[in-house]
Regions:
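Short, well-formed alpha-helical segments that are part of the catalytic scaffolds
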Residues: 13-29
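Cell-envelope/extracellular polymer assembly enzymes that use nucleotide-activated donors
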Residues: 3-5, 38, 181
Length: 232
């Protein structure tokens, strides 16, 4: 079977999570691309009403599963937790803040071909959404990954639709650079990768941790592990 598992980590996303889940659920319920689907929501120790909202949603909509962490684990561990527990043939990880609305997955599904293994949502409107510092960080992240590995990760921080078996082997990276490594390793192994141009949205509530110095340093040091792909 061709089944899709949508993975949504969330932390204090009560303002957006209901819209995110409902719109993705409707899209997949109407779509004929996959034989079956489910939406797995990881509440990573939210302090607001996120858990109550998604619990209520799971009673109204079918094919929704909830994982609840009592204590926040952080975005990296939340990603890994979702990837590790996934069981369907295809997985798609998106955010609970609606920066990647359901129309992005819809765009990918409209361009879906069975002979591709990984679809990368390539954000074409970064200059409209990001401020200057965020643009610089995004540019150098991609450039640094390319210089270290010799392979273009396309848009390393963006969402992806991929076959679960691409994650069967352990990754070298130990932090957020794993997102880039997934694309780099997939291309290096000769699998087919397709970039889909998309427009993502502003983060309307909360604050991204991507620009924190501690996160940036850890991510860029993590990128150094990509050097192994020069000899892979």
């Amino acid at each position: 079977m061709n089944r899709l598992e949508v993975l949504i980590p969330c932390y204090n996303e009560m303002a957006t999570i209901e819209q995110v889940v409902s719109e993705h659920h409707k899209l997949l319920n109407d779509s004929k691309v996959f034989d079956d689907f489910k939406i797995v929501i990881l509440n990573d120790g939210s302090k607001d009403s996120t858990l109550e909202l998604i619990t209520s949603l799971s009673k109204k909509l079918y094919k929704i599963e909830i994982i609840n962490n009592q204590i926040p684990s952080g975005i990296f561990k939340a990603f890994n937790q979702l990837y590790n527990q996934s069981s369907f043939e295809w997985i798609y990880l998106t955010s609970g803040d609606n920066q990647y609305p359901a129309k992005i997955l819809e765009n990918i599904l409209n361009n879906f071909e069975n002979n591709f293994d990984l679809y990368v949502a390539k954000r074409v409107n970064k200059f409209e959404i990001y401020n200057l510092s965020r643009q610089i960080i995004s540019y150098f992240y991609r450039f640094f990954c390319f210089m270290i590995s010799g392979i273009d990760p396309i848009d390393p921080g963006s969402t992806k639709l991929l076959k679960k078996n691409l994650l069967n082997e352990p990754l070298f990276c130990r932090y957020l650079a794993r997102d880039a490594e997934i694309v780099i390793r997939t291309k290096k192994k000769g699998y087919k990768v397709k970039a889909i141009p998309v427009e993502f949205g502003n983060r309307e509530h909360g604050k991204s941790s991507a620009t924190k110095l501690s996160v940036l340093f850890k991510t860029y040091f993590d990128c150094l592990r990509l050097f192994k792909y020069r000899f892979f």
